[in-house]
């Protein structure tokens, strides 16, 4: 078995519209790849933190599991990037999600999505669990950046009707 740790500091990500840089903290422990403490950074919008992130082999399948917290530092830029109309915008500090991806067949399972997840108890923003509001099959059908923006607009429209 191979064990070790390597860190990649990436200052420029080409071909990725949302993020500018990354820090990939890769650990190998008993054949399991652990990506916890890795980050993706958008200098204008915020930072995505990967916790409990692992790539493992289960029943001859390569499975990536991750808990991800996207802390939003500039809501205006976030909403502009996704083209969310002003009436559908909410005060948004972060987006938390848990995913599992089968790398053999490209299937993604979204276990949980929460807007404004309480990290500390003093946050005054209402936490919104979107896990039952989002259809994973619709997400799988998204083929490009434009479709993602349209889908995001639909989700924020639904959220605005809930509040």
Task: Label every model-predicted segment.
Residues 1-162:
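Small-residue helix/turn framework positions
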């Amino acid at each position: 078995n191979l064990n070790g740790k390597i860190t990649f500091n990436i200052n420029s990500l080409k071909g990725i519209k949302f993020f500018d840089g990354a820090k990939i903290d890769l650990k190998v422990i008993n054949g399991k790849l652990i990506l916890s403490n890795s980050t993706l950074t958008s200098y204008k919008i915020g930072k995505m933190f990967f916790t409990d992130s692992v790539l493992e082999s289960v029943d001859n399948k390569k499975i990536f599991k991750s808990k991800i917290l996207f802390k939003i530092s500039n809501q205006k830029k976030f909403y502009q990037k996704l083209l969310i109309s002003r009436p559908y915008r909410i005060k948004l500090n972060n987006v938390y999600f848990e995913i599992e991806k089968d790398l053999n067949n490209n299937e993604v399972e979204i276990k949980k999505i929460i807007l404004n997840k309480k990290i500390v108890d003093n946050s005054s923003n209402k936490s919104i669990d979107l896990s039952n509001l989002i259809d994973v099959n619709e997400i799988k059908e998204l083929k490009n950046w434009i479709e993602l923006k349209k889908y995001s607009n639909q989700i924020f429209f639904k959220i605005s009707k809930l509040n």
